[in-house]
A protein has these predicted regions:
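N-terminal amphipathic/basic-hydrophobic helices that include classical n-h-c signal peptides
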Residues: 1-11
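Catalytic phosphate-donor-binding core of small-molecule kinases
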Residues: 11-44, 83-160, 170-273
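Active-site catalytic pocket residues across diverse enzymes, especially alpha/beta-hydrolases
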Residues: 35, 66-67
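Short, well-ordered secondary-structure micro-motifs within conserved domains or adaptor modules
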Residues: 44-62
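Short glycine-rich anion-binding loops that position phosphate/pyrophosphate groups of nucleotides
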Residues: 55-58, 80, 167-169
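Short Gly/Thr/Asp-enriched flexible loops that form oxyanion-binding sites at enzyme active sites
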Residues: 61-66, 173-177
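Proline-centered loop/turn at the N-terminus of a beta-strand
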Residues: 72-73
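Conserved beta-strand-loop-short alpha-helix elements that form
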Residues: 163-164
Length: 273
């Protein structure tokens, strides 16, 4: 039995998601025992609270396994990796159990992307919490016409384009020299991957941050016809692609945050401390 924020008693259903590492399994067993001891249900059905144990990959798997269900509250327990999405430390399991039991937390609403690829043989749809990467299938130079709300932004030439959410700004985007965006903002960021600039081709070489109302479309041009789509790290090959449409979903995922959660402190802790 747990207590809601208005003081009423209820039964809370949770589900644990973890990878196959021995450390994650060990933490899952400990946490399951602690939660059940407090009357919190741990099961396999669709939960009210989803708890990922591991690194950011475990968190992404949890959200995808629930098809980005926006009724679920999501949170992660870090098992020692960098983990921007997994906030709880293994040493905080007792405190975390009390937090869940007493609903003593705040909620942050975070954005995810809807990606639609239109090809000669049909339409493909993806959802991404971190990013989508669009490249030439053969990993040769990628040629893409880029539009925002159907207005030309540029004709890109380079390795590919990465479009990330604020949550994904600290993942692959950061390796591509993209900007860190605070997780409670609702934006998209276009980050060029190895853009080519010479007297023949001129590309924007800096990341561009767009508001959530915008719709990005990428059209294969010149020698690019077949695409590789990386959606949160999962690879898909699309033959004879016509265009890729990327936008922020109007619905938001709900993430549990501890009351002392502070993104500035997290950035400092992950990169500088």
């Amino acid at each position: 039995m747990v207590f809601t924020q208005d003081g009423n008693a209820t039964y809370m259903k949770t589900k644990l998601y973890y990878n196959e590492s021995s450390e994650s399994k060990f933490l899952a067993d400990i946490l399951k025992h602690k939660l059940e001891r407090e009357g919190i249900i741990v099961g396999d059905e669709t939960p009210e609270i989803g708890i990922a144990i591991g690194g950011d990959g475990s968190f992404l798997h949890m959200v995808a396994a629930n098809d980005f269900n926006t009724d679920i509250l999501y949170i992660g327990v870090n098992n020692g990796t960098l983990g921007f999405l997994t906030e709880i430390k293994p040493t905080e399991l007792n405190y975390f159990t009390d937090v869940i039991k007493n609903s003593n937390y705040k909620l942050e609403h975070i954005s995810y992307e809807e990606v639609k690829v239109v090809a000669e043989n049909g339409e493909y749809n993806f959802k991404t919490l971190n990013e989508v990467v669009v490249r030439d299938e053969y990993l040769s130079t990628t040629y893409l016409k880029v539009t925002v709300d159907d207005k030309l932004l540029e004709n890109f030439v380079g390795d590919g384009l990465l479009v990330s959410t604020p949550t994904g700004s600290t993942a692959y985007n950061l390796s591509g020299n993209g900007a860190i965006v605070y997780s409670d903002l609702h934006t998209m960021q276009i980050t060029p991957l190895a853009p080519i600039n010479n007297k023949v081709y001129r590309c924007i070489t800096n990341p561009i941050v767009l508001p959530e109302s915008k719709v990005i479309k990428l059209y294969p041009i010149e020698r690019t016809k077949d695409l590789i789509i990386l959606a949160d790290g999962k690879k898909y090959t699309i033959k004879d692609a016509k265009h890729v449409e990327i936008k922020i979903c109007k619905d938001k995922l709900k993430c549990i945050r501890l009351n002392d959660y502070d993104y500035t402190t997290i950035i400092n802790d992950k990169y500088l401390s």
